[in-house]
């Protein structure tokens, strides 16, 4: 449709002159985004995990587009050496996310670019919000933000409120090649099951759900802003324990959560965070540390800073998650 093409043109005209990296998988979402915003994209980033039969096909699609449009491209071939570096992360989705964002950061430094385009769409927004609500997550924001900072990069999601079907139709109408990820149909992944559930909703159900999510986000926005400022201060002070302990439990929860994320501890769960709040009681014992990952523990060091420390063998005490720190550590 010509009207649809005009819509994309109008969107592009509103963009600033900033230059971006673009994360492009080869699927319809990222290929549509790549074509819409190619004037603002300095470098395309593609990650090949070599975990599905169509992986090389998708890489070829992205490479061909970049050649035709004179766009520089950086490719990460994830081999066993790369996977070994992230072997401490059991969940593949969490591992893959960390691998690609570390890659984006590396390429950003290489080209001196701090902004990154990601092609999350409205379907992704709904699926994420659905899973968060189903888990009764304590997240202060349901869904996916249009812009945030990830691994030191400013991430923009320019097609977030465009549905996947519309993006695929855009590719078809503009004769842009794309690949379909065959694993999207596998029920072994929670997101795929959620996707099938939402696909059966009526337009009214989608509207009502979106309305409820936006209401939740608005109601929590003030506290979310306060937490964000508190964490900035916490980080600025090198994670001082005395700053942490002065906050109430609600703020402490998110200070720990963001600290663990910054330290690349994948998917810290609610029970772990609540246990850490109890561990960091007002009478903290500096001789003890709490396990947050295999052989990796959190503690208060001699400078009264909350930090991580590694151990291979330790004496487990009352709680199997807690160890007595060895002399000299």
PLM regions and their residue ranges:
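AMP-forming adenylation/ATP pyrophosphatase catalytic core
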Residues: 3-18, 148-150, 217-329
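ATP-dependent adenylation/nucleotidyltransferase module used to activate substrates
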Residues: 1-131, 165-166, 173
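Glycine-rich loops and low-complexity Gly/Arg-rich segments
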Residues: 67-72, 98-102, 140-145, 203-206, ...
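Proline- and acidic/polar-enriched loop/turn elements at helix boundaries
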Residues: 35, 47, 78, 160, ...
């Amino acid at each position: 449709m010509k009207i649809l093409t005009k819509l994309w043109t109008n969107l592009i005209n509103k963009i600033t002159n900033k230059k971006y990296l673009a994360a492009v998988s080869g699927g319809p979402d990222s290929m549509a985004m790549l074509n819409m915003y190619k004037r603002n994209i300095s470098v395309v980033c593609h990650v090949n995990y070599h975990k599905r039969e169509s992986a090389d096909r998708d890489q070829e699609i992205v490479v061909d587009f970049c050649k035709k449009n004179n766009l520089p491209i950086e490719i990460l071939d994830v081999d066993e050496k790369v996977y070994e570096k992230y072997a401490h992360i059991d969940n593949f989705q969490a591992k893959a996310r960390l691998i690609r964002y570390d890659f984006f950061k590396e390429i950003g430094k290489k080209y001196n670019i701090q902004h990154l385009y990601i092609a999350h769409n409205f379907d992704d927004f709904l699926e994420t919000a659905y899973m968060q609500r189903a888990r009764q997550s304590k997240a202060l924001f349901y869904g996916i933000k249009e812009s945030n900072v990830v691994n030191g990069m400013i991430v923009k999601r320019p097609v977030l409120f465009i549905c996947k079907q519309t993006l695929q139709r855009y590719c078809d109408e503009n004769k842009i090649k794309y690949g379909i990820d065959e694993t999207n149909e596998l029920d072994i992944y929670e997101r795929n099951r959620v996707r099938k559930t939402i696909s059966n909703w009526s337009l009214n159900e989608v509207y009502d759900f979106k309305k409820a999510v936006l209401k939740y986000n608005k109601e929590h926005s003030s506290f979310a802003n306060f937490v964000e400022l508190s964490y900035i201060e916490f980080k600025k002070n090198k994670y001082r324990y005395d700053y942490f302990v002065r906050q109430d439990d609600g703020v402490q929860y998110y200070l720990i959560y963001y600290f663990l994320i910054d330290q690349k501890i994948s998917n810290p769960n609610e029970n772990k965070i609540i246990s850490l709040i109890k561990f960091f009681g007002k009478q903290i014992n500096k001789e003890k540390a709490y396990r947050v990952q295999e052989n990796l523990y959190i503690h208060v060091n001699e400078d009264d800073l909350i930090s991580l420390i590694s151990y291979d063998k330790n004496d487990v005490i009352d709680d199997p998650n807690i160890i007595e720190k060895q002399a000299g550590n």
